[in-house]
Amino acid sequence: MSSIQGTSGSSPERLPNSREDEGMNPEGVTPSGQTISFSAVGKSTSAEDIQQLALPIIQSDAMASSPSVGGAVGEVEVAEIIADVMEKNDANVQKLDEDMEALLQAISSSEEQLESPGVRNKSALKGTNRSNSHREEIARNQRLRSLSVRHGLAYNRHSLRRLARGIRHHAGLVTASFATLHKTLRAVPQEDLKSILGKDSDTVLARLHKLGLEVNEKGEWRLRANGEVGSINQSICNLARSAERLHDDGPLSINDQASEEEVTACCSAGRRACQFLQEHLMGALRAIYYQILRFFHWISRRVEVEPEDTDYYMRPGIFINPYASYLSSSPSVEDPRSLRDRLRDGGALSGEDTLFSMPQDESLDSESVSDDDRGFQ
């Protein structure tokens, strides 16, 4: 099956190395020295297989789960917990950039092998005494049998492209929400804001400064493009654009001399790489929704100014994750609860200290949201 290998240390459990198809095994190497390779097998890949492959790289406290706050805690503890989670964003985004480089390299290698005239020929076409018509018939049958596999790869590539467009849309939502928070804070005098935040004021203001929202010498709030929000938004957009560039409108043009086994092996490797790439993009999306937007909404509630209804997913008093169905199907191994249960807990806070208030109806369910609302065009 697909394998993730490291140049030092042992390989992850239940991820055996494949030597048999080494020539057909595209791989990429991260700057840290880790080798990511995709080896094809003769069976379909399940969602559990992809999760098993993705977890060793994308799993982290900040990405795999929302901040867990138990019991009734004070304002200082809430701010410290949020600040601690936010501190991990830079490292997570950097790791995504590094891993993505290796993944894109692996996908490109897989596609080059599919189209290369130098692909090894393991088929029965090596008989030189057979007639040309017989060889052509065998080749035609092989192409027909491999067509479904090729279309499967094309479908995965198309789905990944749509996902990338949607993620770019929601990365922009973070920037728009940051601008809304900027407008909200401008309406609150500095002294009043510090009084409202109480002991949390220094912590929250320092966090806002690092995110890219600061007070200038005139006492006015100013947005900085080089803050964490701008950096994360740009990184996510770069990853999405890289994913979009991998696609064309139809199946790959495969070398006619390749056998059915070779075509299946390469297509399976490409599909695994695409699915693995989706896991990385979803990990980045978790970081956005579980950390930054919750922090913005918490501040808005503290200053008692409801955020504007600028997006379907950020209504006043409601936090809606458009990917709730997807994420709830892939829960963190550290938190077996569903996404709905985790969000309904609201961080186990009470009253005015709740990071966001959850509706009692079914508005959290994302199944009723259309593709256009999700940002998929």
Curated annotation (Swiss-Prot):
Belongs to the chlamydial CPn_0499/CT_392/TC_0671 family. Signal peptide: none annotated. This is Uncharacterized protein CT_392. Transmembrane segments: none annotated. Residues 334-345 have a biased composition (Basic and acidic residues). NCBIfam families: CT392_fam. Residues 1-11, 31-43 have a biased composition (Polar residues). It comes from the Bacteria. Residues 1-43, 109-141, 328-377 are annotated as: Disordered.
